[in-house]
C-alpha cells in the first residue's frame, strides 16, 4: 500500500459562519445529504466548517484542487455509527483518481477536528 497524496486544510470558523447567511453558498458547497443532516445538528457553524475543511483537504490530497471538473458538491463527508468521518466515493471521484494516478483501487482516510476559532481536516489517499 502506497500513499499517493496528502491534503490538509484549516478554516477560520467565523468565515464559514458568515458565509452560511448566503443560501447560495450552502447550495454550491454542500451536498443535499449534508444539508439535510445539518438541519438536525445544533452547532451548524462547526458542522459546516469541518466539512468545508475536509473538502479542501480532499482536493489537495488528489493533487488537483477544484479543477478537473471537480466541485465542492462532488465531495460528501459522512460519519459512521461511532462518528468516524469518511467520504462518499462517487463514480466521478473514481474517474478523477483513476485518470490522475492510473489506479482503480484506493482508500481515503479523513481526520477532522475543531477548536473554538478553527476547524482542520487531514486527508490521505492510499493505493490499495
Curated annotation (Swiss-Prot):
Its main location: cytoplasm. It comes from the Bacteria. GO terms for molecular function: holo-[acyl-carrier-protein] synthase activity; magnesium ion binding. Its cofactor is Mg(2+). Mg(2+) binds at residues 9, 56. The keyword Lipid biosynthesis applies. It catalyses: apo-[ACP] + CoA = holo-[ACP] + adenosine 3',5'-bisphosphate + H(+). InterPro entries: 4-PPantetheinyl_Trfase_dom, 4-PPantetheinyl_Trfase_dom_sf, ACPS, Ppantetheine-prot_Trfase_dom. One of its GO terms (biological process) is fatty acid biosynthetic process. Its EC number is 2.7.8.7. Coiled coil: none annotated. Keywords: Cytoplasm, Fatty acid biosynthesis, Fatty acid metabolism, Lipid biosynthesis, Lipid metabolism, Magnesium, Metal-binding, Transferase. It is found in: Cytoplasm. GO terms for cellular component: cytoplasm. It is an enzyme of class 2 (transferase). Transfers the 4'-phosphopantetheine moiety from coenzyme A to a Ser of acyl-carrier-protein. Belongs to the P-Pant transferase superfamily. AcpS family. This is Holo-[acyl-carrier-protein] synthase.
Amino acid at each position: 500500500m502506497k500513499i499517493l497524496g496528502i491534503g490538509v486544510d484549516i478554516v477560520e470558523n467565523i468565515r464559514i459562519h458568515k458565509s452560511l447567511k448566503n443560501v447560495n453558498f450552502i447550495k454550491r458547497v454542500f451536498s443535499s445529504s449534508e444539508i439535510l443532516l445539518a438541519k438536525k445538528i445544533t452547532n451548524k457553524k462547526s458542522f459546516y466548517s469541518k466539512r468545508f475543511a475536509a473538502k479542501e483537504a480532499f482536493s489537495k490530497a488528489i493533487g488537483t484542487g477544484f479543477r478537473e471538473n471537480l466541485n465542492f458538491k462532488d465531495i460528501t463527508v459522512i460519519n459512521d455509527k461511532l462518528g468516524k468521518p469518511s467520504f462518499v466515493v462517487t463514480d466521478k471521484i473514481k474517474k478523477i483518481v483513476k485518470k490522475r494516478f492510473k489506479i482503480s483501487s484506493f482508500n481515503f482516510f479523513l481526520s477532522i477536528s475543531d477548536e473554538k476559532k478553527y476547524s482542520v481536516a487531514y486527508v490521505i489517499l492510499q493505493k490499495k
